[in-house]
Design a protein with these regions (language model features):
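Conserved HGGG/HGGXW glycine-rich cap/lid loop of the alpha/beta-hydrolase fold
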Residues: 56-61
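Short cysteine-rich clusters marking metal-coordination/redox-active sites
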Residues: 52, 71
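A glycine-rich beta-to-alpha transition motif near the start of alpha/beta enzyme domains, typified by
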Residues: 49
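Conserved sequence/structural motifs within the catalytic ATP-binding
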Residues: 68
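Rieske [2Fe-2S] iron-sulfur-binding subdomain
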Residues: 1-45, 65, 77-195
Length: 195
């Protein structure tokens, strides 16, 4: 059975700001996939499916023991590859006891995840934003929950010409509406650049 999505699965997606991913488990959803993100003791970012194979308990609400995630419900323990390495009360761990792990890349100030075919994950295709991690630039970060369809946000964030008319006086100026827009399409990489 083929599943259809409005989003391409074989693409890199930002899962978090790099500073958000640490030694505490962080839950995020990317393309409808719940993820548990964390860093190993050496600082490498990890992304696992955020549901224990046993009772579907969120691993992001569990705890770390070294580099392993210990489920907060019954103690099933997973390594960084998503393989269950310990089940309390059992001498043998079932071969099928594993959660999905996802390719992760940390580029500039972001932790990126690849939800699609892991063999196709190429970190060199990640769009760069080096200024975000450059001390010569000021970057303001934050989250703003908005109760709307993602399409409305995309439409508004990609259409800067409306700033002059709707947001005039504080972020919109006549120069914004007059600025030429350049669009580049890299079909091979699956990237659209607008500047």
């Amino acid at each position: 059975m083929t599943t259809h999505s409005a989003f391409a699965r074989n693409q890199w997606y930002v899962a978090a700001w790099a500073h958000e991913v640490g030694r505490d488990l962080l839950g995020r959803t990317v393309l409808g996939e719940p993820l548990a993100l964390y860093r190993t003791q050496e600082g490498k970012a990890v992304a696992l499916a955020d549901r224990c194979v046993h009772r579907r308990f969120p691993l992001s609400e569990s705890r770390l023991d070294g580099d392993k995630v210990v489920c907060g419900y019954h103690g099933f323990t997973y390594d960084t590859t998503g393989t269950c390495v310990f089940v309390p009360g059992q001498k043998r761990v079932p071969r099928t006891a594993r959660v999905s792990s996802y390719p992760v890349a940390e580029v500039d100030a972001f932790v990126w995840v690849w939800i699609g075919d892991p063999e196709a994950a190429d970190p060199t295709t990640i769009p760069r934003a080096p200024h975000l991690a450059d001390d010569g630039w000021v970057t303001v970060t934050g989250m703003e929950p908005v109760d709307c369809d993602y399409g409305l946000l995309v439409d508004n964030l990609m259409d800067l010409s409306h700033e002059t008319y709707l947001h005039g006086g504080y972020i919109g100026t006549p120069e914004v509406a007059e600025t030429p827009i350049t669009t580049e399409v890299d079909e091979e990489a699956g990237i659209v650049r607008v500047s």
